[in-house]
């Protein structure tokens, strides 16, 4: 579960086609070991759920970047399939018991995409 409140903004640094989808790598000064700005993201671990532009993804690799595998269905149902290197994405870690809830309960499980036709 997430709150929907953005915690970090990261730049897409790599997009690769993999079996069944795409590998997405993002860099963030907030998680870079060279930036000195680690807390509260210093304890990230593989398998952790991270919201990337509102989509719940499992972290598969950490370091000075974060890596996620995005399956084909998620690419079709979300805007992640439109990403290009250099784009910025919003990140949020999943809630832990006892965390303050400053937003709303958000699962990050996407059903479909919509199109704005008028403003």
Protein language model regions, located:
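Conserved loop->alpha-helix
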Residues: 1-119
């Amino acid at each position: 579960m997430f709150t929907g409140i953005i915690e970090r903004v990261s730049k897409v640094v790599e997009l690769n086609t993999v079996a069944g989808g795409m590998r997405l790598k993002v860099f963030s000064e907030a998680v870079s070991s060279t930036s000195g700005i680690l807390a509260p993201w210093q304890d990230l671990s593989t398998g952790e759920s991270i919201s990337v532009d509102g989509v719940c993804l499992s972290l598969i690799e950490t370091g000075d970047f974060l890596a996620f595998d995005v399956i084909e269905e998620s690419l079709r149902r979300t805007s992640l399939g439109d990403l290009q290197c250099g784009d910025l994405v919003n990140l949020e870690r999943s809630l832990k018991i006892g965390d303050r809830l400053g937003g709303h309960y958000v699962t990050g499980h996407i059903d479909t995409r919509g199109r704005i036709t008028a403003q």
